[in-house]
Amino acid sequence: PSLARAFFKNLRLIFYAAAALPQDLWQRLEELSIATLGHRVVLTSAWGSTETAPLAACAHFEMERAGVIGIPVAGVAIKLVPTGSKLELRVKGPNVTPGYFKRPDLTADAFDTEGFYRIGDAGKLADPDDPAKGILFDGRIAEDFKLSTGTWVHVGGLRIAALAAASPLLQDAVVCGHDREQVGILAWPNIAACKEVCPHAAHHQTPAELIRCPELLAAVRRGIAAYNQQNSGSSTRIGRLLLMAEPPSIDANEITDKGYINQRAALERRRPLVGQLFADQPAAEVILFD
């Protein structure tokens, strides 16, 4: 209580940006401010990037939940463009850079035909019937994401590192952890290699049975644990892993026309597994790393 009184004594507003604020932390701050001061301290946010110098939207009003980035600031236009299952945020205004220095290739890719900057983030209206209530941040259109600490996770490199660390046991994987405290991996097993590790695996054993094999789980744990010893940073360290029995689906766009895993589509389709991976009390098949 004494620390809370000292913390809130002269506090009038809490501003956060660069990474999402978990809703449970938002609620705890509100509850603590009410218990200490008798009223709620205002929490607010804004949004933008280096290319928007850096402000593009802000919330100049009280918000009821985390994740609202506000409305466009004066002189700025933001349009929401359907991209897959999300709406991509694109920005235009006098604050937006005209391009990248001596990189016409990057400049051409960064803007659409109407001159809007492709920032790579997704969003949606907090209230579809009232745009004045602001835009709700909805993750990244691109694969890379931030942890709740604000640290960027570079998905492509981490995916390759995870597959190499547990080689040859993993066929492919998707990287999870947007707005989480740690990185998680959903991985497809290399069935043939996994059967070599499980001496008692019957030839006809199903993938769902195979991925519960104790010897397999132990082997994957050893490989990832060895990788973690050399990669202790939050953006590269793997905190938990779950093997998946169902292979990636072409019909569900989990595999691109080039044969690559579509990270965003896979995570969207396998959202229940992501929830299982990050559960407070995970199931036995979730491999946890200290």
Roles of regions detected by a PLM:
Residues 81, 87-147:
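Conserved ATP-binding/catalytic segment of the ANL
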Residues 1-4, 32-41, 126-131, 164-169, ...:
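Alpha-helix termini
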Residues 43-45, 51-54, 116-125, 135-141, ...:
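Extended, hydrophobic alpha-helical segments in both membrane/secreted and soluble proteins
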Residues 171-176, 181, 197, 221-290:
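Conserved C-terminal "lid"/linker of ANL adenylate-forming enzymes
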Residues 96, 131-161, 194-214, 234-235, ...:
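Adenylate-forming
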Residues 1-85, 181-182, 189-201, 226:
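Conserved adenylate-forming
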Residues 122, 165-193, 228:
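C-terminal boundary motif of the adenylate-forming
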